[in-house]
UniProtKB/Swiss-Prot annotation:
Record keywords, A-Z: Cytoplasm, Methyltransferase, rRNA processing, S-adenosyl-L-methionine, Transferase
Record EC number: 2.1.1.166
Annotated gene: rlmE
Upper lineage: Bacteria, Pseudomonadati, Pseudomonadota, Gammaproteobacteria, Thiotrichales
Localization: Cytoplasm
Disulphide connectivity of cysteines: none
Name of this protein: Ribosomal RNA large subunit methyltransferase E
Family to which the UniProt record says this protein belongs: Belongs to the class I-like SAM-binding methyltransferase superfamily. RNA methyltransferase RlmE family.
Length: 206
């Protein structure tokens, strides 16, 4: 199949996707909103007054839901390389999470406070080389985990998108070293053919 045909098929599948249609109907920013809603329904991670960091936030599908869960007295900082339209109650940083400059801006907003939950829907820009793309994905996951274990409250939580493949099992072992309970969850709103799942880690050992 040619690249043009592949792109055309993706557009057709995307525009007829149930969750895309529902997101449009409900005014959600993306189908990803349903994923974080499913995660909350199953694990009840987000509570009033919590401090949350959302990595890989654009276009804001997770942030627009989580900010409702934590209420007006909660705090949510979102970060992404891409622009994101403002969301009431969300502080946004545009920058590359792997850069020292962006990391420093994030730390300034955190202001030495401990975080209740770090959520990450980060994924690399795909090159088409599966081996390279998977390695870059695992690298982002390692950065997110390092950030979480540095900044979380004791008993805090961590949620991140993982693509099944080389390095994913080893990554889960790393997560288990720092959290009391680690589970894998594939939301119904994930595309069936996608290799993605979410690692949900609770009870940060501190």
């Amino acid at each position: 199949m040619s690249k043009g045909s592949t792109t055309k098929k993706w557009i057709q599948d995307h525009t007829s996707d149930y969750y895309v249609l529902q997101a449009n109907k409900l005014g959600y920013r993306s189908r990803a909103s349903f994923k974080i809603i499913e995660i909350q329904d199953k694990y009840n991670l987000f509570k009033q007054n919590m401090f949350i960091i959302d990595l890989g936030a654009a276009p804001g599908g997770w942030s627009e839901q989580v900010v409702k869960f934590i209420g007006n007295n909660g705090k949510l900082i979102a970060l992404d390389l891409l622009e994101m339209a403002p969301i009431a109650g969300v502080e946004f940083i545009q920058g590359n999470f792997s850069s020292d400059e962006t990391y420093e801006r994030l730390n300034q907003l955190i202001n030495d406070k401990k975080i209740d939950c770090v959520i990450s829907d980060m994924a690399p820009n795909l090159s088409g080389n599966k081996t390279s793309d998977q390695a870059r994905s695992i690298h982002l996951l390692e950065l997110a985990l390092d950030f979480a274990t540095t900044n979380l409250n004791r008993n805090g939580s961590f949620v991140a998108k993982v693509f099944q493949g080389q390095g994913s099992d080893e990554y889960l072992k790393l997560v288990r070293e720092s959290f009391n309970k680690v589970t894998q969850f594939k939301p119904k709103s994930s595309r069936p053919k996608s290799r993605e799942f979410y690692v949900v880690a609770t009870g940060f050992k501190g």
